[in-house]
Amino acid sequence: MEEGKRWIVVPIWRVPGRMERWHSLVKYLKYRTKDLEKVCYVPHHKVGWAWWTCSRVIFPLKENSHLEIQAYWNLTPEKGWLSSHSVRITWYTEKFWTDVTPDCADTLIHSTYFSCFTAGEVRRAIRGEKLLSCCKYPRAHRSQVPSLQFLALVVVQQNDRSQGNSATRKQRRGDYRRGLRMARQDSRGYKQRGSESPPTRAHFPGLAEVLEILA
């Protein structure tokens, strides 16, 4: 007796374009800026038997947990073919695992990666001093109820930037785009150059924006 086709059903987020943009940014932040140095990037040819998997990006987190973003291709919808890629975002802990939204994933990533305001910045802002740190992952705070201290620091940071020159303002708007450009130039791998200074830390725009996720 012929065995019927078996289906694997998991929650996914549709991605309208190809995954090169996501892969390039991950490799740029891992090998170039070192912001994601601890992250494990697994391309499709190393996944093994899961031929429908385009890539896996594993973010080690605190308390022996990790976040896995798995990209799929060649999926079959109810009719026709799925022309776009999709991703599954899963959070694994010692006791359980669950699928999460991009907003929740941003919060989890920011708990371990990309610097934020330090504890002493509120006192510096009150004294009118220049802030010594800033949040490199502002998108991760959108799903949370921000504290008054955080909102005040964001306003101070924005005012400092507005008083700067035009190059500083353009840098804020196009920071991650330049990162993607550099990533494409280094798509064949980054070779260490002893005479060059390390690149500056990058802002992370958030998963939904990078992947252009369609909810």
Swiss-Prot record:
Q: A single GO BP annotation from the record?
A: viral life cycle
Q: Where is this region: Disordered?
A: 162-203
Regions of compositional bias (Basic and acidic residues) in chain numbering: 173-189
GO cellular component entries:
host cell cytoplasm; host cell plasma membrane; membrane; virion component
Induction / repression: Expressed late during infection in a Rev-dependent manner.
Extent of the signal sequence: none
Tell me any Pfam family this protein matches.
Vif
HCCH motif, short sequence motif: residues: 110-141
How does it get modified after it is made? Processed in virion by the viral protease. Highly phosphorylated on serine and threonine residues.
- Kindly report the protein's main subcellular placement as a broad class: host cell
Stated membrane topology is: Peripheral membrane protein
- Write the record's keywords in alphabetical order, separated by commas: AIDS, Host cell membrane, Host cytoplasm, Host membrane, Host-virus interaction, Membrane, Phosphoprotein, Ubl conjugation, Ubl conjugation pathway, Virion
| Chain positions found as Phosphoserine | 147
Highest taxon, organism lineage? Viruses
Q: Which InterPro entries is this protein grouped with?
A: Vif
Free-text domain note: The BC-like-box motif mediates the interaction with elongin BC complex.
User: Which family is it part of?
Assistant: Belongs to the primate lentivirus group Vif protein family.
Function per UniProt: Counteracts the innate antiviral activity of APOBEC3G. Forms a complex with host APOBEC3G thus preventing the entry of this lethally hypermutating enzyme into progeny virions. Functions as an adapter molecule, recruiting APOBEC3G to the ubiquitin-proteasome machinery. Targets APOBEC3G for degradation through the assembly with elongin BC complex, CUL5 and RBX1. Binds viral RNA and affects the stability of viral nucleoprotein core. May play a role in viral morphology.
> Other comments?
Required for replication in 'nonpermissive' cells, including primary T-cells, macrophages and certain T-cell lines, but is dispensable for replication in 'permissive' cell lines, such as 293T cells. In nonpermissive cells, Vif-defective viruses can produce virions, but they fail to complete reverse transcription and cannot successfully infect new cells.
Give the protein's recorded name.
Virion infectivity factor
- Which organism does this sequence originate in? Human immunodeficiency virus type 2 subtype A (isolate NIH-Z) (HIV-2)
